[in-house]
Design a protein with these regions (language model features):
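Generic surface-pattern signal
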Residues: 16, 137, 178-182, 251, ...
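N-terminal Rossmann-like NAD(P) cofactor-binding subdomain of oxidoreductases
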Residues: 1-109, 255-257
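C-terminal substrate-binding/catalytic lobe of Rossmann-fold NAD(P)-dependent oxidoreductases
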Residues: 1-4, 94-95, 99-233
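Glycine-rich loops and low-complexity Gly/Arg-rich segments
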Residues: 42-44, 64-68, 121-125, 167, ...
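Glycine-/small-residue-rich active-site loops that bind phosphorylated ligands and cofactors
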Residues: 18, 165, 238
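Conserved active-site and cofactor/substrate-binding residues in soluble primary-metabolism enzymes
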Residues: 5, 12, 75-82, 123-131, ...
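Generic C-terminus detector
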Residues: 228-260
Length: 260
């Protein structure tokens, strides 16, 4: 295929545009898409207020059916939703506190940092928890975040309060997640996969292009339910977990799939 023409030519033949421009740039493109009558999908770097709709497959596919446009939430919000939404659907109520241990930069972003520091996000809560409520407002969630000098993954430390009478055990929570798409559960002690570096080596070992891991990774032996309090860790490959969400968002906007 020979690439030629400009944005006007593209919008003349497109049904939907996935806008992956840098954060806060997409707003300048919105009017162009609307004028051309083209549907649009922005990314998590844009604000929910700009689009009025946000999307993640596990939380609100149906609400996004046939809309003019939406915003796929960030990699972290996507990862939180994948494990929290099944819990909410079972319990009918959920209160969550989480800490996001964020990679400092993507592997190719050599100009970013920190390099030899841990940098807290001093805006509390960080945007990640409130962003979950743009796709599942019934979940009560707050988050804090720190950036650490690594490039390969984020890690979430999650404490979820379940309601009385939830009927779950540590084992049944793990079983629930094992039935969900886009979640990988492994026992770190048994497999030796106890760090994010080893998780990404696993992605390469199973033949994923670019070493991508579209699923989120939950350590089985890091899951513990004590009474009504659930503790767990999960790892997020920030470069790839939203890719299938964008594909699902296209299907929702075009009305071709009623369920993700």
């Amino acid at each position: 295929y020979e690439c030629h023409g400009g944005l006007t030519d593209l919008l003349g033949v497109a049904d939907v545009v996935i806008d992956c421009s840098p954060g806060k740039v997409g707003a300048s493109n919105l009017e162009k898409y609307q004028s051309a009558g083209v549907k649009w999908v922005f990314q998590g770097g844009e604000k929910h207020a700009m689009t009025g709709m946000s999307y993640t497959s596990s939380a609100n596919h149906a609400e996004n059916l046939n809309v003019d446009g939406t915003r796929v939430v960030s990699c972290n919000t996507t990862g939180l939703s994948r494990t929290l939404v099944p819990l909410y659907n079972h319990c009918g109520q959920l209160s969550v506190e989480c800490t996001m241990i964020r990679r400092a930069a993507d592997p190719g972003d050599s100009s970013k940092g920190p390099i030899n520091a841990i940098k807290p996000v001093l805006k509390v809560p960080s945007h990640h928890g409130p962003d979950v409520m743009t796709v599942k407002p019934e979940i009560s969630i707050n988050s804090m975040a720190v950036a650490v000098p690594t490039t390969i993954m984020h890690v979430h430390v999650i404490v979820a309060q379940l309601p009385e009478g939830h009927g779950l055990t540590t084992e049944s929570v793990i079983e629930m997640w094992s039935k969900q798409p886009r979640i990988i559960l492994m026992n770190g002690g048994e497999t030796g996969i106890t760090t994010t570096a080893e998780v990404m080596e696993y992605a390469r070992d199973i033949g994923r292009k670019w070493g991508d891991l579209h699923e989120i990774f939950v350590w089985r032996d890091g899951v513990k339910l004590e009474g009504n309090t659930l503790y767990y860790f999960q790892a997020i490959h920030q470069e790839s977990d939203v890719i299938p969400e964008n594909v699902d968002a296209i299907r929702a906007l075009m009305g071709t799939e009623s369920d993700w």
